Design a protein with these regions (language model features):
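Conserved catalytic submotifs in the C-terminal HATPase_c
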Residues: 77-81, 99, 104-114
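Glycine-rich ATP-binding loops of the HATPase_c
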Residues: 205-214
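Short beta-strand/loop element within the Bergerat-fold HATPase_c
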Residues: 141-153
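Short conserved segment of the HATPase_c
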Residues: 166-180
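A conserved beta-strand-to-alpha-helix junction within the catalytic ATP-binding
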Residues: 77-91
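Conserved micro-motifs of the catalytic ATP-binding
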Residues: 71-76, 115-118
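Short helix-loop "hinge" at the ATP-lid/N-box region of the Bergerat-fold HATPase_c
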Residues: 134-135
């Protein structure tokens, strides 16, 4: 327990220390982008700096959030909300990205309202992480099935997709920090998305599970229904 606490504190402190100089780098890159630069090579350097600094910023933010979520050191405000509306809104944000990746999203959900107790900001992040994961790793030209159903007093959200490559990894390993299904590391990402989603779901008294069967990936969120 002490070891985990020390590791979490170290990650938080290091992330904070890196964030300060990174902010300066990002600000200077923004200033460089506003300058008129005729040299194409220099323009390309600025573009790479901009992209990679944004990537590093996202990684640091994920690190800090994963650290806080895993220890419960994060504010959670539960309130009754419509799971159907939340799911529809977040999935809608990914329509263009999914289309760009040649993915056909099929959503099956009952008419609202379907009420659960959750923190809107954290539930958004959980679904957002799952959709981001799908857009990165799903096989182009396939369908992504997302469903919301009520069963025995529970509200269950299920996300199913076919992976680009066979998932030679257990569901437990996939939810560990820094682990990615793409072992070749051909896609950008921190490997923290599923770990954060699992921790945040638990903090909202929900359940987060993953099932893997060959190249079939399934993520299941479940919360008690409220009336």
């Amino acid at each position: 327990m002490k070891s985990e606490h020390f590791k979490t504190e170290l990650i938080t402190n290091v992330s904070h220390d890196i964030k300060t100089p990174l902010t300066s780098i990002i600000n200077y890159v923004d200033l460089m982008k506003k300058e008129k630069v005729d040299n194409k090579t220099v323009q390309e350097y600025i573009t790479v700096l901009d992209r990679q600094s944004a990537r590093l910023k996202k990684l640091i933010e994920d690190l800090m959030e994963a650290s806080k979520a895993s220890t419960g050191n994060i504010k959670v405000e539960l309130e009754a909300m419509d799971a159907t509306v939340m799911l529809t809104q977040v999935v809608g944000e990914f329509e263009e990205r999914a289309k760009k990746n040649q993915l056909d999203i099929v959503v099956d959900s009952p008419e609202p309202p379907v009420k659960i107790m959750a923190d809107g900001r954290h539930l958004w992040r959980v679904i957002d992480n799952l959709m981001s994961n799908i857009c990165k790793y799903a096989m182009p030209g396939t369908r992504v099935y997302i469903s919301l159903e009520k069963f025995n007093g529970m509200v269950i959200m299920t996300f199913r997709n076919i992976s680009k490559s066979q998932l030679n990894i257990s569901s437990e390993e996939l939810m560990e920090r820094f682990v990615r299904g793409d072992s070749s590391r051909n896609t950008e990402g921190s490997g923290l998305g599923l770990s954060i989603a699992q921790s945040l779901t638990g903090l909202m008294n929900g359940n987060f599970a993953i099932q893997i069967d060959g190249d079939l990936f399934k993520a299941i969120l479940s919360f008690e229904e409220v009336f």
